[in-house]
Amino acid sequence: MTNIRKTHPLLKIINSSFVDLPAPSSLSSWWNFGSLLGVCLGVQILTGLFLAMHYTSDTATAFNSVTHICRDVNYGWLLRYLHANGASMFFICLYLHVGRGLYYGSYTYSETWNIGILLLFAVMATAFMGYVLPWGQMSFWGATVITNLLSAIPYIGTDLVQWIWGGFSVDKATLTRFFAFHFLLPFIVTALVMVHLLFLHETGSNNPTGIPSDSDMIPFHPYYTIKDILGFLIMLTALSSLVLFSPDLLGDPDNYIPANPLNTPPHIKPEWYFLFAYAILRSIPNKLGGVLALVMSILILAIVPILHVSKQRSMMFRPLSQCLFWLLVAVLFTLTWIGGQPVEHPYIIIGQTASVLYFLIILILMPAISLTENYLLKW
């Protein structure tokens, strides 16, 4: 008799995705982040659902409802901090996942890669709208500054901003719609994740060598299920430690001050995971130019497959490209640091230099070094 997991209409989908899936035998821990992102998404949806039961999306009561959750709801403080720091873990895993894709040439699976970019944008939009909901000072001013960037779009900009705001400033209508979209988007993200996996399973996984591994495959279960569970334990330990020992480490103290449209905070900045893009935005002294650079800093990922000119897929055997990759990582850390600093000397020039380097490495230096390595292969 055939096993039910191979015949049942629903179980056979799960079976072919997580049990009998042929996987390359050489996958390293860098391949753990996909499953970790799945866990993060699950944690965020669950904690978010319970938070939404007690939250009120009204400017008069939003801040107090969050305080009420932390003080009066059973384990409300735990839910709130799991959700806030869960977002940080989500982005750590997300950036490591994208970095893995860049390093090992996974972007040559163009459908999977493009859905991934779409997912990145969707998660960033969700996180931005979620940050507005507690209605603290940084929530209000962050929403005002970032939505106002759309006014840089010629002709329709101002109308577009007022349409998003639902009025002439960030107010009750804005908060209500942001809550609605913040609730809706994670489910759209979940659907996109399924499409992401669908396209991935069409081609099979890449591996660290970048060499086709069709002749050396192992079943996903038990080998990679056990490996993934170890990843879950490490990540959940890190998240628990952050939540239970220093829950406000990654937050902004200004967000404990209720939103006040008459009082601007000295330094308006987004959460840490957007600081690199914020630094690129600020480094250009023109509004429209800054907005374009901001969008391009993420959208540039879409042209990475076109810029791949190397004869080898992975960077595993390309030491020169490896040096450039780690320089890019250093530039991103620098941008993240600069994004949190005030706009004054010497931070301005450091930010501008790092922004130029960021685009220079991806657009010019990486392809140039790849061509050099191709030439060296002939020796």
From Swiss-Prot:
Localization: Mitochondrion inner membrane
Transmembrane segments: 33-53, 77-98, 113-133, 178-198, 226-246, 288-308, 320-340, 347-367
InterPro entries named among the record's database cross-references: Cyt_b/b6_C, Cyt_b/b6_C_sf, Cyt_b/b6_N, Cytb/b6-like_sf, Cytochrome_b, Cytochrome_b_C_euk/bac, Cytochrome_b_N_euk/bac, Di-haem_cyt_TM
Effect of N15T: In strain: Isolate TK 34552 and Isolate TK 34560
Residues the entry annotates as binding heme b b566: H97, H196
GO molecular function: metal ion binding; ubiquinol-cytochrome-c reductase activity
Tagged with keyword Metal-binding: yes
Residues involved in a ubiquinone binding: H201
Cofactor note: Binds 2 heme b groups non-covalently.
Note: Heme 1 (or BL or b562) is low-potential and absorbs at about 562 nm, and heme 2 (or BH or b566) is high-potential and absorbs at about 566 nm.
Family: Belongs to the cytochrome b family.
Complex and partners: The cytochrome bc1 complex contains 11 subunits: 3 respiratory subunits (MT-CYB, CYC1 and UQCRFS1), 2 core proteins (UQCRC1 and UQCRC2) and 6 low-molecular weight proteins (UQCRH/QCR6, UQCRB/QCR7, UQCRQ/QCR8, UQCR10/QCR9, UQCR11/QCR10 and a cleavage product of UQCRFS1). This cytochrome bc1 complex then forms a dimer.
Protein name: Cytochrome b
Species this protein is from: Uroderma bilobatum (Tent-making bat)
